Regions:
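Non-catalytic, mostly N-terminal accessory regions of nucleic-acid modification and defense proteins
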Residues: 1-233, 312-336, 341
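SAM-dependent methyltransferase catalytic region
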Residues: 193, 197-384
């Protein structure tokens, strides 16, 4: 995916380690592509303002676009295996080696499909992304800065083939599958970082902290911690050893939630607690858990998005299993925060100081805030 996205950017005149082609010199772009080029430039400039050098900003953008599409496809595979959506990825012989949705689309749009290299799959995927984004914007928002570039048909088909053939359906049913993919994706960057550790001037930059410090906690550790914290609190409440509370008043927060392994396990525990309490129906409980009980923070935006995604899938799974409507549009309330920020720097910071140059109090406040948040991507939720 990354090599493919890099080539797509080259088609837009954007290079790594080479000057960019001026937009007015790109005569072959359509009006839509010209707008895409402008939006891609803005996204890369935003990364530069966050501290990346220009070439590294381009590389980071490529990585984020690739990661976005990989996770979208993985999420679709999880949902189709769980029966939450009709199959759109996996091809079946009975559907003419197309997916169920693909075959239905082909029946009504044969001419369109014939002229598309992927048989219309890319078009279908965008429709599905837009539909899911109506329920959860995280990761599926087709108007975000990482959606202006679309992988080639060949690349998409290759990734889909790998997801459908190299990972069995039972594995896709596991709650941890999204976290495993997240860990694998970051393990490559982590390995690259530690190959430099014997260098004399080796150091880990703030931008490398998320990938370097992430550890996927084994199930038995997660279960042990949840059993000796959340489960213990509830048990003590039931046995009169602790003041009794309604389940919706019990809060659990993971200040470095990663891809949500602890929160997913806590979700199951809270669900059983609500069922035992008996105040709400099984159609209400999933929403109550997200609204009242589960909270997560991380310095990695992608980790936060993936946590939101798996909690979204978890909610739809519980609703489906108990015979309730799985359309969550307008009903989800997810308490997740990315403890990250892009500080003003360069000219923008100087303009702010100039604006308040006659107010020493405000200037001092700007100085203090800037110092506190200078390493926000490192400190995360430790900042008070």
């Amino acid at each position: 995916l990354e090599k493919d996205i890099e080539q797509v950017l080259i088609n837009y005149g954007i290079y790594i380690n080479k000057g960019w082609v001026n937009l007015r010199d790109l005569k072959n772009l359509t009006e839509e592509q010209e707008n895409n080029r402008k939006n891609i430039e803005k996204a890369i400039e935003k990364l530069e303002k966050g501290g990346f050098e220009k070439d590294k900003a381009v590389m980071e953008y490529i990585k984020e676009v690739s990661y976005t599409y990989l996770n979208r496809l993985a999420a679709l595979r999880v949902m189709e295996v769980r029966g939450l959506i009709d199959e759109i990825l996996v091809p079946r012989g009975e559907h003419g080696n197309r997916s169920f949705i693909g075959s239905r689309f082909y029946e009504v749009a044969r001419e369109f499909c014939k002229y598309e290299m992927d048989g219309g799959l890319g078009y279908l995927l965008n429709i599905m992304f837009e539909e899911i984004s109506e329920e959860i914007k995280m990761l599926f928002n087709t108007e975000d800065e990482y959606s202006f570039v679309t992988p080639s048909s060949a690349s998409l088909l290759k990734v889909i083939e790998l997801l459908c053939t190299n990972i069995d359906e039972e594995t896709w049913r596991q709650d941890e599958i999204i976290g495993w993919i997240y860990q694998y994706f970051n393990s490559i960057e982590k390995s690259e970082i530690f190959t430099r550790q014997n260098q004399k001037d080796f150091f880990i930059s703030v931008d490398e902290v998320p990938a370097t410090t992430q550890i996927f906690t084994p199930d038995w550790v997660v279960n042990w911690i949840i059993d000796n914290s959340l489960n213990k609190v509830y048990s003590e409440m039931k046995n009169g050893l602790r003041g009794k509370k309604n389940v919706e008043d019990i809060k659990l927060i993971d200040p470095c939630c990663g891809s949500g392994h602890f929160l997913v396990r806590a979700y199951d525990v809270f669900y059983e607690m609500y069922v035992e309490e008996g105040k709400y129906t099984k159609g209400e409980i999933p929403y109550k858990i997200l609204e009242n009980n589960i909270h997560g923070i991380d310095i990695d935006l992608r980790a936060v998005q993936l946590t939101g995604l798996i909690l979204f899938i978890k909610t739809k799974t519980y609703l489906k299993e108990n015979g309730y409507d799985t359309n969550t549009q307008g009903k989800l309330s997810v308490n997740l925060v990315c403890a990250d920020a892009i500080l003003l720097n360069g000219r923008r910071l100087e303009d702010l100081k100039e604006k308040h140059k006659d107010n020493k109090t405000i200037l001092k406040m700007i100085e203090i805030i800037y110092e506190e948040f200078e390493d926000v991507r490192l400190k995360g939720s430790l900042i008070q």
